[in-house]
């Protein structure tokens, strides 16, 4: 027999090659091997829409007025299978949108609501997202009706925004343009814990110091969006919680005023659910039985819906009128003294010591019954923290100001990961430019590109100087939140001009020349920087025997200091760059893993990463002019020498120091070159070696140049949403 059980009574009569629950994977055998999967996500093999589908074009056929009308109607169309609290789904839809957008973190730009990732694991099954599967299922008839003209990503955020409008808030605006993904994201690190809601301590150097939370995380526990509503590790202490609220919201790009506004505005409507026994709740959607059809947390033992729903375990509404936008949150927060109590589900919550009957919210099903309002530990932080309280008091005194600040903060929360305003679509896009959008003015397109290139070529700047400067300007781009990139030429502004990774002294010299050329020709500095890199690449290709023109589209603008929130760019500072063979310091994560992470953020595939790194090495662009990995005696020529010499068995590779290796002549033992781990991994990893061997072949010299130029142009244009 062949071991597959074919022909054996009682055994599985199918091959096990495609079985998802059995067998041993490569990752099981070699858990520490470099995993390139994060570079191979979201391609045509998983996307059912086909290569010709363009969501931005599909949006042009969307009847936005009709869609919003249908969403308004949905809010009060209660369904028996999941009844609306007080007959209004607004609170549920807002929580869905909040928890989609609120997973964003500034450190790497990942998370957020820009991809519809809440539909997939792990987010669809997070403890903090209990019963949001019901919100998305309630939206399904709307999605079904409008089809491909509206993505799930846009619909989820729009539903939350319309929910606020339906309850009386004048919102700041809304932009369409979020395209869906079709499988779970593999690149986002949510933490190392192996259990939901594991104690916070493992993700902090010291849990008493919120700033010591592990980067890039922005939530206090695995499976939460930001803080534990019952207190740090479930132990109520509003002043302690306030410190963690401040840190987690800062990691979501929010200042103190925005934090108070979002907390209060998010809790002005809706309620918490904990009127029942959490032990009766079934498994999450990913673990639920097939008969649940993608829903989770089902209660088949008791009623489990309406007033008997269990979600967070906390039970009650924050305000007297939970389906109405008003200032009731602050009225109750400051109007009463509060004490700790336990919910029916056993969760800690704050309730008023003594409250007028008319200030109590009514039952979600029977308006003749009233219950105490509640506050979470985070809500009490708004009252007790010495920084948050004055902000909350101002909001209490000035409801119009509160509404405006909240509307703006909600817009920021739900659009922060969309990138610049050029990506916004739809009739409700606000006219006002906001500094967190990293605005860039339009650049000229009517100048003589050939004349600019001629001036650059005659400037005396070397290939390495031109290519390095263009690369440093463009490499900040992150496909996660669409920030960074060459457009705007912010490399000449603080803080980028002073970043160690940009070699400030060298950068200032090169920029001095390029800025002069820009002034003389009418081109933007941003365009001239990119053109400089293109000129360098073309010169290097010519030195290798190939004439090629790097694609270029003029029109980049130059940002100013007034358009730049310098502090917000700190998270974009490169602390490593494998393409320029540089590490700011030693890290616990291996250099090759850091390389993969950066390549993924830049939107590169594995073969694009390979060809770019090999090309950058022979162009002599290493940080500080080091020679590590420069495996050529023709530096400055765009040759395949890096791959030829890396794969040459006439050489041997010996460790010389931490992250430093010597490449020696196998016969004589003479040192020929030095290299780092990110160089040698292209010969040691089986997949990367396969790519390296392609470019080392004798018939691949021209292919290498063509592939390098294509990948280079992709990096230079990654942020050109104005021409996409």
From Swiss-Prot:
Formation of the three residue Trp-Tyr-Met cross-link is important for the catalase, but not the peroxidase activity of the enzyme. Gene3D superfamilies: 1.10.520.10, Peroxidase, domain 2. One of its GO terms (molecular function) is heme binding. There is a cross-link at residues 98-226 (Tryptophyl-tyrosyl-methioninium (Trp-Tyr) (with M-252)). It is an enzyme of class 1 (oxidoreductase). It comes from the Bacteria. Its EC number is 1.11.1.21. Coiled coil: none annotated. The record marks 95 as: Transition state stabilizer. InterPro entries: Catalase_peroxidase, Haem_peroxidase, Haem_peroxidase_sf, Peroxidases_AS. The active site is at 99 (proton acceptor). Homodimer or homotetramer. NCBIfam families: cat_per_HPI (TIGR00198), PRK15061.1 (NF011635). Bifunctional enzyme with both catalase and broad-spectrum peroxidase activity. Belongs to the peroxidase family. Peroxidase/catalase subfamily. This is Catalase-peroxidase. It comes from Cereibacter sphaeroides (strain ATCC 17025 / ATH 2.4.3) (Rhodobacter sphaeroides). The lineage of its organism: Bacteria, Pseudomonadati, Pseudomonadota, Alphaproteobacteria, Rhodobacterales. The gene is katG.
